[in-house]
Swiss-Prot record:
Gene Ontology MF: a single term: structural constituent of ribosome
HAMAP family tied to this protein: Ribosomal_bS20 (MF_00500)
Gene Ontology CC annotations of this record: cytosol; small ribosomal subunit
InterPro entries: Ribosomal_bS20, Ribosomal_bS20_sf
Name of this protein: Small ribosomal subunit protein bS20
Membrane-spanning parts: none
Organism: Ligilactobacillus salivarius (strain UCC118)
Any GO BP annotation: translation
Amino acid sequence: MPIIKSAIKRVKTTEKANAKNSSQLSKMRTAVKKFEKAKTAGADNVEQLFNEAVSAIDKAQSKGLIKANKAARDKSRMAARLAK
């Protein structure tokens, strides 16, 4: 437990940022899983779910939660899966 005032503030800030980042990553993963599940099941709204997943990946990448290469790789794999 920090004693210095600035260290106490950093702990609070870090916890808040960690919660926000975890939430954003979770949303991204959920969107990708929904797309995968819909594609496997042969649902009608696969295009919409694909767009939502790509949007979630782009948001995570722009916030620095995932690297640009991972974002591109994930989107490419999903696009290839959509085309099948």
